[in-house]
Amino acid sequence: MQKANVVKLVLLLMFNSVLYSSANAQFIGSLADLPPTIENYPLERLSERVYVVIGPHEWPNKKTKGFMNNPAAILTDEGFIIVDPGSSADVGRGFLEKLKCVSSKPVVAVFNTHLHGDHFLGNQGIRDAYPEVPIYAHQRTIERLEAGEAQEWHDRFNGLTEGALANTRIALPNKALKGGEVMKTGGITLKIHHPEHAHSDTDIMIEVVDDKLMFMGDISMNKWTPYTAMPQDASFKGTALALKAAIDNADVEVYVPGHGYPEDKTSMAIQIGFTEDLLASIKKYYLQGMQAHDMSELVKKDLQKYSAWDHFDELGKVISHAYVEVEQDNF
């Protein structure tokens, strides 16, 4: 009897090792080696309650059908809380299918960390299955999406993917957050943090107190050159301050970025270093009288230690927007 139990335990551990990995585990292989749709990406277990699919590092295109973010879920006593269900209804549905291998519990809430399309356009995939599910976002996210940016994001992704979002309807968040909320639900506690302006002016960071884990949205993008998607939305100094605040939170050990692998305080600090190095380099050449287009190659050279990051070749458009922030500070 004892031998049978040992065999069962070994089989269970083998199953879990295939299906999930811990937050500190090394991911095997390259994301580029995997097929582009969410169905082919593994569901990773980051903590006792948190699961995530690490998305590809490509911009939306026909092959990926727009999938690019890290859809995640928290399993509570009452059911799943989904964070950023992805960039289309199909991505949202695909993520739901993956969660069925963890539990048959329903989805009880959805959170969108900010207004960008790869984080909220998957809402419909959840709403179709759970029509009454509340979708939370910062009040500024809701305001901007309702003012027309939701349709702009849909049209942008549908164009980039050559029609992959043709059957995706817009499902807007309907529960406004301000930041500072402490939400107790299903046996867990969530703390909502809102930096005034970081990756955008709509960001929330979601702290899962019980698991010592924080969802960063796109304030954090691990080994992905920050700001390359929507630099016009960002505050560069604000992003660095938000990252510092997250690192200084002694109750958090694992950070889930909007793109890239899960992080610890060390890798988060490297991202702060990038922003500080970027602004310092731009300021150096600004004080020499250079315009943004004159200094672009020089700044890239100064930041060569980050050149292996995804989308580093697009740093030029980031420099032009960061230049404006430096100019305002030194006018």
Regions found by a protein language model. Give the residues of each.
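Accessory terminal helices/loops
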Residues: 26-33, 248-253, 262-331
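Divalent metal-coordination and catalytic microenvironments
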Residues: 49, 74, 84, 99, ...
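Conserved beta-strand hairpin/beta-sheet module of binuclear metal-dependent hydrolase folds
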Residues: 48-98, 206-216
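Metallo-beta-lactamase
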Residues: 79-81, 87-89, 182, 189, ...
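Boundary at the C-terminal end of the N-terminal hydrophobic targeting segment
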Residues: 21-25
